[in-house]
């Protein structure tokens, strides 16, 4: 199967590198007690070694990680709906619980192919769920202050607003 998909996998990997050429670094978003959250693009194997845990938002490119690995698969260019954001946040909370239970400093990487959109939307939803932000624009500002090239589109922002209403019990 790997041979069959090799051309696609190579193209997708190269595409992620071309789009992120100007911003290859991961960005530190937030530090909570012994856990620091970073946001970035799909990592190389050597990059994953800098982290004790990784959260993979990429459905189209596999990553081989020896670290604590959690995944919420989503496709590029398909905005996550509010229910999908909720499920992704639940999985991210599992990772954060595992990381915070450790006695040593934990570095956590949340990523998508480019580190611009899918992972950013999930992180914004998590920031609101954990009450680090009370509004969508505040969550986006937290992320963009560390990673200014992040851009969520109108549909993603709308879905984050719906997710926020669900958090408050105002949406079905």
Language-model segments: residues:
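Transmembrane alpha-helices and immediately adjacent membrane-cytoplasm interface residues
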Residues: 1-18
């Amino acid at each position: 199967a790997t041979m069959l998909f090799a051309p696609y996998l190579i193209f997708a990997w190269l595409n992620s590198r071309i789009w992120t050429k100007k911003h290859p670094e991961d960005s530190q978003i937030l530090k909570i007690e012994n856990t620091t959250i970073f946001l970035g693009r799909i990592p190389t194997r050597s990059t994953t070694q800098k982290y004790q845990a990784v959260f993979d938002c990429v459905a189209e490119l596999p990553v081989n990680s020896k670290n604590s690995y959690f995944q919420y698969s989503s496709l590029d260019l398909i905005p996550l709906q509010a229910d999908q954001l909720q499920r992704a946040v639940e999985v991210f909370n599992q990772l954060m619980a595992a990381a915070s239970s450790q006695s040593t400093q934990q570095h956590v990487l949340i990523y998508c192919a480019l580190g611009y959109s899918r992972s950013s939307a999930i992180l914004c939803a998590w920031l609101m769920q954990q009450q680090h932000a009370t509004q969508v624009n505040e969550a986006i500002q937290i992320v963009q202050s560390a990673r200014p090239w992040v851009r969520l589109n109108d549909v993603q922002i709308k879905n984050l607003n719906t997710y926020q209403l669900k958090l408050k019990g105002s949406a079905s």
